[in-house]
Swiss-Prot record:
Keyword DNA damage among record annotations: no
Effect of a null allele: Paralyzed flagella, leading to a loss of motility. Electron microscopy image averages show that a density is missing from the inner dynein arms region in axonemes, which probably accounts for the paralyzed phenotype.
Principal subcellular localisation of the protein: cytoplasm
Sequence ranges of Basic and acidic residues compositional bias: 102-113, 579-596
The protein, known as: Protein kintoun
Keyword annotations of the record: Cytoplasm
Any single biological process term in GO: outer dynein arm assembly
Residue ranges, compositional bias (Low complexity): 279-293, 529-543, 564-577, 604-617, 628-659
Amino acid sequence: MPGKEENDTLEKSLKELNLTSDEMTKFEKAFKDPEFIKLFEEYAKEVSDPKVKAETDAYLRQIEQQGRAEDVYGAGTQLIVPDPAGAVIKTKVVSSSASKKQQQEQEKQEKEQQQQAAGAGKPEGPGKQGALPVGQKVFINICTCDKLERYSLTDAQDPATGRLRPKLTIPLSLGPVRQGADKQGAPAAVYDFVVHPDSWTFAAGNAAGLATLADTALDHVEQVGRCRLVRAWKRLNCRYKGTEGAAEPPVQCIRTSAAAAAGAAGEGAGGRVRPRPDVPGVPDLPGAKTAPPAAAGAAATAAAAAGAAEGGAGSSSRSTFSFDKSRKAGGTEAAGAVAKQEATITDPARPGYRHPDGAVTPEWGLLHRGEADLGEAWGDAGKGLAAGGRVPKELVVRVTLPDVSSAAPVDLDVGARCLALTVPNRYRLSVQLPYGVDDAKGRAKFDKARKVLEVTLPVVPPPAPPPGAAAAARAGLALIQELGGSEEAAEVKAEVEVEVADVMGRDQEAAHAKSEAGAGAGVKSPHTAAAASSGAAPAPAAASEEEEEEDKEDGGPAAGSGGDPAAAAAAAGASSGRELTENERKWRELHARQQQEEQEQQEAAEAAAAAAAAAAEPSSRSQLTGTVAQGGAAAAAESVAAAKQQVQQQPVAAAAAPTAVLRPRLNRELAMELD
C-alpha cells in the first residue's frame, strides 16, 4: 500500500498535467483504489521490462527488413538498424550547462509552450532530455548504417580568413540516452552514434579523422544532454557497450523532409513517430523489402543539421513517440485512388466492392480443411497423397475487419450453403459455400489483435451408397468382366474362335501322327511280338491313358453327359458347388467341346488305322505263304519286309520321321483370370 507521501506526490503530478476537473476527479479516484494502483504498477514494470524492450526492437527490425516503415509510420520515415563498428568512446560529465534554477525556468517555459500547443489543437510532445549529472560516465558507441549519407570532403571558404579550406561533412544519427552501468556498477549514460560505413572507414584510417569523428559525437551528446564532457576521451577495447535488455544496438527512427511534406511537421524534432492508424496489424509479407528513396540520405543529413542547430535535439530526439494526428492532408490523393478502384469493382463478393448502402465487402478467404492418412504414401516417397475428389471435413471462412474492435456489432448468418456477414454501415459479405454445412455445429472466433473473424463450419458428409452399389463397385474392380452383346464382345468372341481353330488344327496333325503309330502297330514284328509276350503295354495306349487322366484333371466331360458340352459345363458347375458366371460357363463349354472333338478325331483315326491294317494283313499273308513255299525262310523274311514297306506307303499312314508334338493345354481357371 502506498503511503500518504506517495499519494500526495501522485496528486501533485496530476495537477501539473493541467487536466480538467472531471479528468482530475477520475484520476484521483482511480489512484485511491488499491486494485488500480496494483495494475498500474504491473503495467509500469512490464513497460520497463528488458524482455518487452527486446520484443519491441525485434518488431521494428522486422518492419525494417520488410521495407514497410513508411506504410506503418508514415511517409518520410526510415528505420535504421545500427551495426557496431567496434569502437567505444569513454568520457565523463564535468559540468552541467544549466543550474537548478535555470532548469526550473526552462521546465516552466516548456510547460507554457505545451499549454499553448494544447490550446491551438496541436499534439503535446514530450519534453527535452534532462541534463546529465556531474561526474557521470558517458559511453558513446560508434555504429554504422548504409541508409545514412556518406561523408563529403569539399573546399569551403573560411569566414574568418576568407581562404579556401577543406570542409568535412559527416551525416549522422544519435540515438536516445540509455541507462547503463560501468565496471563498478555505477550509473552511466550510453549513446549510439551512427554514421555511414564509408565515413567510419575514412575516420579510422587516420588519427585526424578519428579525432574529428569523436569530437563530432561529443558535440552532439553535449547538445542533447545539456552538459559539458571531458574532451580527453578514451577508446575502450570492446566491440559494443550494451545495457540491460539491449546487447545489440536498438533500432532508431529518423524523419526526412518527405515527412514534413506529408503533414507530419507538427511532431517537430522532439517527438517520435507513431504507427499510422489506418494500417491494421502486421501482415506477413516476406520478401517485400524495398529500396530506400534516393533522397533519403541527403534529407537525413539536412534533418540532422537542423536538429543540431536547434540546440535541443539532434537526431536522437527523433526516436521518441508523439501523438500527432495531423496526417490527413497527405492522404487525399490516396483516398481518391481507393475510391476510383472501388468504383471499378462490380462483383459484390470481391473485396472492396461498395454496396448501395455504403457498406464495403471486406477481405475474406475460404479454406478447405480435411484429413489424410500418411499410411497411403508410406514406403513411396514419390507417391504423395491424392487430394482430388475428397470432400473436406470443414470449411474455414476468414474475414478481415480492420474497423471492428470486437465481435459485438458483427451479424453472422449461416445457411446450408451460404454465409452472410453484416456490420452496420461498414461491411457486408455474402459467400456461396461449395459444400453443404451443418450450421448448428459451426463456431466463430474473433482475433482482436489481427482484427480477423474466423468461422469454422463442419461439412455435411455425403449420403452412404445403397447396399448393391458396393457389390457392383467390387465387381467392377475384379479381373473377370462380363461381355455383353456389343460389337466389342463379338470381336473378342471371334478372336477366341480363331485361337480355338488353331488349336484344333494342331490336334488334327497330332491325330494323323497317332494314326501312323496305330498302323505301324498293326503289323507285329518279332520285337513287337516279344513285347506282347512279355506283358508290356504299347506306347499309344499309355499315351491315351495319360491324356484321359489329364482330361479328368482339367474338368473334361463328365460321365453320363452324353457328349453335350453344355451339360458337361453344367455338371462341372454343380460339382464346384457354386453358380457359374456367363463367362465361366462359356469357357467350360468351349473346353468340353474341344475335348469331345479330340476324342472323336482320335476314335476316327484309330478306326482308319484298324481298317488299313485289316486290309493289308491278307495280302501280306498270301505273299508270305507263297514265298515260304518257294524259297524258304530267307525269302519269307524279304516278303515280310516288302509287305511292311507297302503298308508304310499307304496314303493314310504316310508320315515323315517321328516327331514329338507338344500341344498346349488350356487351363480354364487361368484363362478366365486373364480375360
